C-alpha cells in the first residue's frame, strides 16, 4: 500500500506527464501510440544536462547468441538531434533547447568544431575506453557484454547535418535566431567545409576502413543547405563560400553516388551494395522526389532490403560475424520515401505493419527479426520511436484511398 508521501510523488509525476502530453500537437490518427513514443523520447532526455540517450540499455543483442552487442547509454550528436527534432515537431521545445545548450558546452571545450566526437556521455564528457565484461553471460548467452562504445573514436562526418536541421527547425518554430544558434550554425558549416571530402565510418559505424559514404555526403550537403535557409530566413549574410560549397557537395554526390549498373544510389562511391540510408538523397531534398534516380533507389531498396514489416540497413559483409534484424528506423525511412514518390497506400500499409509490432507497452526496440518474429537490440530505442512519430505526422496529410 502506498504511503501518503508516495501517493503525492505519484500524483506529481502523473500531473507532470499529463500536462506535458496535453501541450503536444498530435496527429489525428494513432494518437495513443504517438503519445507513447513521445513519452519514451522525453524520458530519454536528461534534463539537468540536455544530453539524450540513444537507448537506456547496453548489450541487448542484435542477434541472439551473437557478438553484435553494443552500449547505447550515451548521447550521439546525430541521434540526439533527431530525437529532440521529433519532440519539437510535436510542439515541445525544451528538449531541443537543452540539447543545443549541451552541445554548445562541448564546443566550448573543443579546439575546433570539426574535431567533435560522434558521441559523448550524457553529461558531455568524453567516453572511457570500450570494455568487455567477461564475467557476465549476456542476454540469452549473447556475448560479449560491453561498457563504453568505441565509435567515439570514429570519423563520422554526417553528424553536422542533423544538428543544423535542428537549428533550422527550432529557429523557425521560435520565430527568432538567437546569436548562439547562429554561432552554432556557422560552426557546423565550418566543420563541413574542412572535412566533407574525407572518407568516414558513416552512420552505421562500421568497424573497418572508412569509405566515401553516400549518406555522409548528403548530410554534409544538408548542413550547408539548412544553414543557408537559416541565413535567408533571418536576413543574415552568410559567407560567400557557402553557396559554392553546397553546389560542390551536391555535384560530388550526384556524380559519384549513383551506380548505373545497380540503378540506385549505393552505400559508398564505387560500390554496388545498397544501403537504406541512401534514401536521404531524396528525403533531404537534394534530389526532387520525381527524379528517376531517387525513384529507382526507392524501388531497389524495397526490393532488396525489405522483408515483410521491416527494412534492413544493408546486406553486405560488414566485417562482423552473425546476422542482425531489420531496423525500425530504416522502415520508417522507406515509408517516408513512399510518401515522397506518391505511393500513399503503400506507405500506409507499411506503417500499419510497423504499428502491429508495437507490444503491449507501446515500445519499440532497435530491430526486428521477421523470421523469428522477435524484437532485437537495445530497448527502447530512440531511433525507432522518433521514426514512428515522424511518419505518423506525415501520413496525417495523406489519407489512404
Name each model-derived stretch.
Residues 1-401:
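Acidic, mature catalytic/reactive cores of soluble proteins
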Amino acid at each position: 500500500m502506498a504511503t501518503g508521501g508516495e501517493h503525492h510523488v505519484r500524483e506529481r509525476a502523473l500531473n507532470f506527464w499529463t500536462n506535458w502530453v496535453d501541450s503536444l500537437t498530435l496527429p489525428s490518427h494513432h494518437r495513443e501510440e504517438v503519445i507513447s513514443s513521445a513519452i519514451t523520447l522525453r524520458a530519454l532526455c536528461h534534463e539537468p544536462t540536455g544530453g539524450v540517450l540513444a537507448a537506456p540499455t547496453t548489450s541487448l543483442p542484435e542477434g541472439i547468441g551473437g557478438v553484435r552487442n553494443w552500449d547505447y547509454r550515451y548521447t550521439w550528436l546525430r541521434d540526439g538531434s533527431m530525437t529532440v527534432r521529433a519532440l519539437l515537431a510535436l510542439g515541445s521545445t525544451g528538449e531541443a533547447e537543452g540539447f543545443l545548450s549541451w552541445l554548445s558546452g562541448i564546443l566550448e571545450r573543443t579546439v575546433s568544431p570539426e574535431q567533435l566526437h560522434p558521441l559523448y556521455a550524457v553529461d558531455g564528457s568524453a567516453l572511457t575506453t570500450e570494455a568487455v565484461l567477461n564475467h557476465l553471460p549476456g542476454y540469452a548467452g549473447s556475448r560479449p557484454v560491453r561498457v563504453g562504445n568505441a565509435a567515439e573514436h570514429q570519423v563520422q562526418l554526417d553528424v553536422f547535418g542533423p544538428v543544423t536541421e535542428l537549428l533550422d527547425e527550432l529557429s523557425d518554430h521560435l520565430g527568432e535566431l538567437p546569436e548562439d544558434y547562429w554561432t552554432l550554425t556557422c560552426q557546423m558549416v565550418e566543420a563541413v567545409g574542412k572535412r566533407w571530402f574525407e572518407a568516414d565510418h558513416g552512420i552505421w559505424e562500421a568497424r573497418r576502413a572508412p569509405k566515401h559514404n553516400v549518406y555522409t555526403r548528403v548530410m554534409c550537403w544538408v548542413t550547408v543547405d539548412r544553414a543557408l535557409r537559416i541565413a535567408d530566413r533571418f536576413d543574415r549574410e552568410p559567407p560567400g563560400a557557402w553557396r559554392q560549397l553546397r553546389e560542390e557537395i551536391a555535384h560530388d554526390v550526384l556524380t559519384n553516388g549513383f551506380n548505373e549498373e545497380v540503378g540506385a544510389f549505393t552505400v559508398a562511391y564505387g560500390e554496388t551494395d545498397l544501403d537504406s540510408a541512401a534514401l536521404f538523397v531524396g528525403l533531404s531534398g537534394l534530389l526532387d522526389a520525381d527524379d528517376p534516380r531517387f525513384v529507382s533507389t526507392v524501388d531497389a531498396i524495397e526490393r532488396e532490403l525489405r522483408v515483410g514489416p521491416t527494412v534492413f540497413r544493408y546486406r553486405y559483409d560488414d566485417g562482423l560475424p552473425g546476422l542482425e534484424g531489420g531496423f525500425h528506423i530504416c522502415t520508417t525511412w522507406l515509408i517516408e520515401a513512399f510518401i515522397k514518390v506518391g505511393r500513399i497506400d503503400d506507405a500506409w500499409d507499411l506503417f500499419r505493419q510497423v504499428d502491429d509490432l508495437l507490444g503491449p507497452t507501446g515500445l519499440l526496440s532497435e530491430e526486428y527479426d521477421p523470421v523469428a518474429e522477435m524484437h532485437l537490440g537495445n530497448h527502447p530505442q530512440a531511433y525507432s520511436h522518433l521514426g514512428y512519430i515522424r511518419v505518423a505526422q506525415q501520413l496525417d496529410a495523406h489519407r489512404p484511398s
